[in-house]
Design a protein with these regions (language model features):
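Conserved nucleotide-binding and Mg2+-coordinating catalytic segments in signaling enzymes
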Residues: 158-180
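Hydrophobic transmembrane alpha-helices and their membrane-interface boundaries in multi-pass
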Residues: 5-82, 89-93, 111-114
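The cytoplasmic-loop to transmembrane-helix boundary for the fourth helix
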Residues: 98-116
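Juxtamembrane or sensor-core-proximal signal-transducing alpha helices
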Residues: 134-161
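Active-site-proximal structural segments of metal-dependent nucleotidyl cyclase/transferase enzymes
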Residues: 178-191
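Loop-to-transmembrane alpha-helix initiation sites
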Residues: 127-135
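Short helix-perturbing small/polar motifs within transmembrane alpha-helices
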Residues: 92-103, 140-148
């Protein structure tokens, strides 16, 4: 939908605008490996967003951004230690809004949180790890709830926009959509 595309575009724009200065800073301070990671993240995110915008593949684009953002936050956490863990919180929230497939976002987010905790390089001690697990788990649950509620409300509003409130019959909007689909199918079949 157009709303999903706008989320993808805004994510791409703000990711590039915010991560790019960090990449420059990393190179200037001698953290070349992290600077390269940041540069690769910005480049890949920008390319994926342009693809989604050009071809209208918002769901595929959103899923790919979930993977890229999460893995980028994971690698950043591993390379920078506890300072990099803060990027994981951004990834957790973004994951539930970049794709309408909430199950995919849930599974991938959970896997990345557990993987970060298992590797343990990001945390100085067990207390930090358990604190991260508690806060990231809570944030993931709350993000899931908000994304699920948003999806339900969007579906309800779409249903209301498609039906006549008095009769419950489908309205002109549905007819135009069905006519468009019929014309496309007719063109494909060549009849």
């Amino acid at each position: 939908t157009d709303f999903q595309l706008s989320i993808v575009l805004l994510y791409g724009f703000f990711s590039a605008a915010i991560i790019t200065p960090f990449a420059i800073y990393r190179f200037l301070t001698g953290a070349t490996a992290v600077g390269i990671l940041d540069t690769v993240l910005v480049t890949v995110i920008a390319c994926v967003v342009v693809y989604g915008w050009k071809y209208g593949e918002t769901e595929r684009t959103g899923k790919f951004l979930v993977v890229i953002g999460s893995l980028g936050a994971l690698l950043s956490s591993e390379m920078l230690g506890v300072i990099g863990v803060f990027w994981m919180y951004v990834a957790i929230v973004a994951n539930f809004f970049l794709t309408t497939n909430i199950r995919f976002a849930t599974v991938f987010t959970t896997a990345v949180i557990i993987l970060l905790a298992i590797t343990g390089k990001s945390f100085d001690n067990a207390a930090l790890m358990w604190s991260f697990l508690a806060t990231s788990g809570l944030l993931a649950v709350l993000s899931y709830i908000v994304a699920h509620q948003y999806e339900r409300q969007r579906a309800n509003l779409e249903h209301l926009a498609d039906t006549d409130p008095l009769t419950g019959a489908f309205n002109r909007r549905v007819m135009e959509r069905e006519l468009h689909l019929a014309v496309e199918e007719n063109a494909r079949k060549g009849t």
